Amino acid sequence: MIQMTLIQIDNYGPWTVTPRPRNESDLQILQAELYADLERQFANKKGLVFFTRFDNLLAVTNGIDEEDHLRIQRSIRNRYPITISMGVGAAETPHEAQKLATIALQKEGGAQSSKRKEILAIDSLAPADENNLVQAAHIDINSVTETLTDIESAFDTNFMVNKAQHYLMTKLIKKGALLFFIGGDNFMAPCNGLSEKEIEDILVEINDEIGIGLKAGIGVGRNMEDAAYMADLGLEEIRDHDNGMWTWVIEKEY
């Protein structure tokens, strides 16, 4: 079972234009600093935050309980000009878990409601036992430096990376998995419920459809930090074998 947390800036849209529109650079700085701050705090509890839309962030939070979430909310309130609300949900697939988290928060009021502030809406928490594991795939583009970065313009390379992301997201969401861009040519996919063969089939399909070669290290652990690190190690194994396989699975031993 995987646990997801939705983090939403309270009443953010109206705040950005009150009493007058704020400088765009200031808003970008606020969003970037808030993301880094949240990443640091959730990482201290072995979670992982994805910036998603910056005013709405998603995190994999297995092992992070109600009090942990409340402490993070208080910390943000004390140091920022905004507050955050959170929804938490746990399910067999990441897509279903984030859906439960979203619905729980939506029931407490709209994102731009002036009456909703610093809500923690918990639908469900994943039990903290050895049977509740997180599975994540770290996916990247094969030889992106040689095939894109060093020969195409920066924006055209970015376009191709976004194209790969779009195809991956479209196919993974149908299987109940999620996908997030994590920099460079890298993507992280919380993917509880998917087999190695299903992930490989998706990578093969994308290569056939748009000619972009991909590989995936797949990690399994009791929390997202461990799962992501195992996925990183799996990706290194593929690189060490000259990208000769599509996937490599590593499960953390405890």
Curated annotation (Swiss-Prot):
Keywords: GTP-binding, Hydrolase, Nucleotide-binding. It comes from the Archaea. It catalyses: GTP + 3 H2O = 2-amino-5-formylamino-6-(5-phospho-D-ribosylamino)pyrimidin-4(3H)-one + 2 phosphate + 2 H(+). Its EC number is 3.5.4.29. It is an enzyme of class 3 (hydrolase). One of its GO terms (biological process) is biosynthetic process. GO terms for molecular function: GTP binding; GTP cyclohydrolase IIa activity. InterPro entries: GTP_CycHdrlase_3, Nucleotide_cyclase, Rev_trsase/Diguanyl_cyclase. PANTHER family: GTP CYCLOHYDROLASE III (PTHR42202:SF1). Belongs to the archaeal-type GTP cyclohydrolase family. Catalyzes the formation of 2-amino-5-formylamino-6-ribofuranosylamino-4(3H)-pyrimidinone ribonucleotide monophosphate and inorganic phosphate from GTP. Also has an independent pyrophosphate phosphohydrolase activity. This is GTP cyclohydrolase III. It comes from Methanobrevibacter smithii (strain ATCC 35061 / DSM 861 / OCM 144 / PS).
